[in-house]
Amino acid sequence: MPVLHNRISNEELKARMLAETEPRTTVSFYKYFTLEDAKTFRDNLYSQFVKLGVFGRVYVAKEGINAQISVPANRYDEFKIALFASHPALDQVRLNVAHEDDGKSFWVLRLKVRERIVADGIDDDSFDPANIGHYLKADQVNQMIDDPDTLFVDMRNHYEYEVGHFENAIEVPSDTFREQLPMAVDMLQHDKEKNIVMYCTGGIRCEKASAYMLHNGFKNVYHVEGGIIEYARKAKEQGLPLKFIGKNFVFDERMGERISDDVIAHCHQCGTPCDAHTNCKNDGCHLLFIQCPVCAAKFEGCCSQICQEELKLPQEEQRSRRAGRENGIKIFNKSKGLLQATMHIPSPEKSADEK
């Protein structure tokens, strides 16, 4: 029986990837469709992707597929043929190719079956995920963004919004997508007659969010086709002015793609303009935060002096300290509350409703 999962250590796989000289293409895609046998589909796709040397993260569920991967450039056409043939619903599925790509975005293939391809927390049998808002192409986005009767709503997490967003976009301040959905409904309760434009990184979250808004009585709901990635690609191809400012956060080793030259965020340690995310080098913390080169050198890649000092302890002592902490600390290493407490960042003066 073939092995349908990875058995090599992350360290060895990462070293192999960094030693590669062949160019790779980073690409993401998603599709909502009914998948009757997710396990069999997963195993077949895994076998195909392994043969093609695909790395990345892929989730499949009864509601479809969500993938962020890197493909050897010389096998990209083979990859497309295999993907398009894997299920009728995936024939000619839209592929979002990365803008800034050194080919080092992933080093292992992880293909998992999940309950949902995006965790939404929706538990309502009357909700119809197929009833979605209208797609907007890049030129339509630019036409609508200055309309006073149109609201652009960012359906990403706080750390994504912080480094880049559409001009005048509304942030739904939360740590997770499942928290955002009811929050967005509450925040926009008095704007049901306006045009509501949802957007996210590649389209998967804002597509479901558009269906959720329609389900909750909003009338004129839109979402950016292909998300920020596709918008930026099309805007540049067509010579359109970019209405997205800053960097697009991505969930791989790159942690971001520059869309415009604007740097709208600041180092969480010294306050200098900076939009480079990193994880604290202390594995017992692993906090996601923004750090400039000066502070990276000063704190040795750590988020604080406490973590910097802990990192210098013997390995056994570090392991002992990690074991004594709550198991959830790594799970919630992107929490805004944890970030504010660790970095001593004050909470915004205005509430979400006031904003």
UniProtKB/Swiss-Prot annotation:
Its EC number is 1.14.-.-. Residues 333-355 are annotated as: Disordered. Residues 146-240 form the Rhodanese domain. PROSITE patterns: RHODANESE_3. Keywords: Oxidoreductase, tRNA processing. HAMAP family: TrhO (MF_00469). This is tRNA uridine(34) hydroxylase. It comes from Yersinia pestis.
